[in-house]
C-alpha cells in the first residue's frame, strides 16, 4: 500500500505563524532558495534584495512545484513585489498573501488576528486541508512551544558548552527545518541534551554573535570556528528570533494569542521600534558575554541598511566589536569574507 504524501505549505518569512498551517492539517516548510538568481534578473530591478531574487529564480525553475501552496508576506516592499511576480510568472504552487503589521500595539494584534482567520479559511480550502478549530490550534501551539523550549535549551548549551554543541552543529539542526519534522528534531535534540549532561569540555576563543539577515549556508559559522572563534549566538530569523517567546496557552482566542506572540517576539528591522531592537541586541551581548558581533547583510536590504549604523554604535557601547558582512545571499565572494572574518577574530583574540 502506497503512503500518501503529506500536503506541504511553504512560507518565506518567520513572521508567518506555522501554528495556523499545522492546525489546517498541513505541513509547514520554510522556503530556503539555493539556486543562483540569474533567472530572475530580467524580471526585477537590479537593486532588488538578493534573497527575493533567489526565491523568484528557484520558483520560476520549478524548485517548489511539488508544494501545495506558499504563503508570502509583506515583510518588506521587495517581498510584496515578489507576490505580484509570483502570480504572473510562477505556475505552481499558488501563492497566498499575508498582511503583517509593523507595529506591536493592540490595534495591530487585533488586525493580525483577523488576518490569521482569513488565512486559516484559505488553508482549509487546500486539498486535504482541514477546518482550523480552537482544539487544533491549541494542539499546534503546544507542539510549537515544546519545540521552542528545546531550541532554547540548545541555544543555552551552544553558548555555555561549545564542546558539546558547536555553532556549526546547532546551525545544521536548524537548517533541517525543525517545524517540518517535529518528531525527528525532538529526537536529535534529546540526544544532544543527554550528551550535554555528561560533557564538561570547554573551548576558549573570542565569543561571537551572528545577527542580521538570514544566513542560509554554514560557511560563515565554519570559518569563524576554524579561525578560533566560538559562535555563542545565532540571532537571526533562522535562529533565536524565530524560537524566542512562546504562545500563551489556554487562551479563549488562540488566534489572538498566536498573533500577539509573533508581533511581540524579538523583532527584525522590518518592524517599527529600533530602540527595542537595540536593547535586545545589547541584552544578547551581555547574556552571552560576547566579544564580537558579526552582522550578515544581504545586498539591497533597505530595512537593515538603515539600522546598521545604530547597531554598530550599540555594539561598541556594550563593550564588543562589530563586523558587517554584505553578501549576495549565495556568498559568492566567500574567500573575501574569510579574510575579513579571520582578521576580525585575530583582532578580538
Predicted regions: what they are:
Residues 54-125:
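Acidic/His-rich segments in extracytoplasmic proteins that coordinate ligands and/or metal ions
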Residues 44-61, 269-283:
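Glycine-rich, highly charged phosphate/nucleotide-binding loops
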Residues 37-45, 104-109, 240-247, 333-335:
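Short, charged, surface-exposed secondary-structure boundary motifs
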Residues 308-349:
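Peripheral docking tails and interdomain loops at the edges
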Residues 12-33, 211-284:
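Redox- and metal-dependent alpha/beta enzyme cores, enriched for Fe-S-associated oxidoreductases
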Residues 285, 289-294:
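Proline-aspartate-enriched helix->loop->beta-strand connector
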Residues 2, 10-11, 38-41, 49-57:
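Metallocofactor- and cofactor-centric catalytic cores in central/energy metabolism, strongly enriched
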Residues 2-8, 117, 121-245:
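A charged, amphipathic alpha-helical module
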Amino acid at each position: 500500500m502506497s503512503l500518501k504524501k503529506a500536503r506541504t505549505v511553504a512560507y518565506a518569512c518567520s513572521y508567518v505563524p506555522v501554528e495556523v498551517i499545522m492546525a489546517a492539517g498541513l505541513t509547514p516548510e520554510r522556503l530556503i532558495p539555493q539556486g543562483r538568481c540569474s533567472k530572475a534578473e530580467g524580471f526585477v530591478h537590479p537593486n532588488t534584495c538578493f534573497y527575493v531574487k533567489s526565491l523568484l529564480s528557484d520558483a520560476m525553475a520549478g524548485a517548489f512545484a511539488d508544494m501545495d501552496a506558499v504563503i508570502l508576506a509583506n515583510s518588506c516592499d521587495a517581498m510584496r513585489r515578489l507576490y505580484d511576480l509570483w502570480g504572473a510568472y510562477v505556475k505552481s504552487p499558488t501563492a497566498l498573501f499575508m498582511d503583517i503589521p509593523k507595529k506591536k500595539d493592540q490595534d495591530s494584534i487585533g488586525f493580525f488576528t483577523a488576518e490569521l482567520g482569513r488565512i486559516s479559511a484559505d488553508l482549509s480550502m487546500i486539498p486535504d486541508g482541514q477546518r482550523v478549530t480552537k482544539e487544533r490550534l491549541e494542539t499546534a501551539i503546544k507542539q510549537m512551544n515544546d519545540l521552542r523550549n528545546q531550541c532554547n535549551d540548545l541555544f543555552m548549551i551552544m553558548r555555555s558548552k561549545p564542546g558539546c554543541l558547536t555553532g556549526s552543529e546547532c546551525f545544521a539542526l536548524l537548517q533541517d527545518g525543525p517545524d517540518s519534522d517535529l518528531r525527528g528534531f525532538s529526537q536529535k535534540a534529546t540526544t544532544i541534551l543527554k550528551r550535554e549532561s555528561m560533557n564538561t569540555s570547554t573551548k576558549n576563543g573570542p565569543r561571537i554573535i551572528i545577527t542580521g539577515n538570514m544566513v542560509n549556508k554554514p560557511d560563515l559559522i565554519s570559518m569563524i570556528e576554524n579561525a578560533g572563534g566560538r559562535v555563542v549566538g545565532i540571532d537571526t530569523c533562522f535562529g533565536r528570533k524565530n524560537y524566542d517567546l512562546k504562545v500563551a496557552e489556554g487562551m479563549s482566542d488562540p488566534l489572538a494569542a498566536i498573533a500577539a506572540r509573533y508581533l511581540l517576539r524579538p523583532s527584525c528591522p522590518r518592524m517599527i521600534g529600533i530602540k527595542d531592537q537595540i536593547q535586545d541586541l545589547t541584552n544578547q551581548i551581555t547574556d552571552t558575554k560576547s566579544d564580537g558581533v558579526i552582522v550578515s547583510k544581504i545586498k539591497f536590504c533597505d530595512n537593515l541598511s538603515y539600522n546598521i549604523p545604530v547597531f554598530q554604535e550599540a555594539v561598541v557601547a556594550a563593550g564588543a566589536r562589530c563586523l558587517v558582512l554584505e553578501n549576495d545571499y549565495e556568498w559568492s565572494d566567500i574567500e573575501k569574507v574569510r579574510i575579513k572574518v579571520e582578521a576580525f577574530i585575530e583582532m578580538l583574540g
